[in-house]
Amino acid sequence: MRKVWVMVLVGVLAWALPGSALAEDIWAEHGMVSSAHRLASRAGAEILTLGGNAVDAAVATALALNVVEPNASGIGGGGFMTIRLAETGEVVVLDYRETAPGSATKDLFASEQAKTEKWSISGGKSVGVPGWLKGMWTALEKYGTMTFAQVAAPAIRLAEEGFAVHPMQTGIIQDELERLMAYNDPATLPFLDEGLPLAAGKLLKQPALAKTFRLIAKKGPGVLYGGPLGEAVVAAVNKAGGAMTLDD
């Protein structure tokens, strides 16, 4: 088994904790997982207990973050991964940040109309071509020991069974409610309950996301890059005013 140390930048969303919680030192002999959400960290730790290495655990954690903090992490975005190979000390960096579609120009957001309508923040023009899935898949293939299906299992379980919404998450849904309603059919949004943000403590279930992860596990990243999932992304982006193609 190839030994690695890994640090994944997955879009941290944190809130203030009591001073006593921050002061406590925690030690572990064989491995430790830290992320923006305890359920995502638990997913990574589960993979370690099943014999996975650090990269396997990192990908499992990132997949679970897609479920528990969908506003900040996941398949529609991108990121970086820094890996240190324990055997050689070599440091490897994977860059899978999202990129601008081929139709974008350097002055796309420079016009007065773009500034007034906030093209860089809202709508299809603000959406980059996602690199996250390709990054996760590449990390697993090159440095992991487990399959996508294996590391995605905790995230799929979370998406299907649901988890209790945090009060901050309810606030984020409320803050983004106007944009969510503008670009989506409210009836399809799992974040709403009769048109209102899910209240803190309510279960958030995302069966469509679980189905997506299962499809990727079965068919590979090609379902997004050139496949039916990619077609759906392109259609949604362009419907919202963007200009993305499947070639992107």
Model-derived features: positions:
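Positively charged n-region of N-terminal signal peptides that target proteins for export
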Residues: 1-4
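Bacterial N-terminal signal peptides
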Residues: 7-16
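Noncatalytic scaffold domains of N-terminal-nucleophile
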Residues: 22-42, 46, 54-55, 59-226, ...
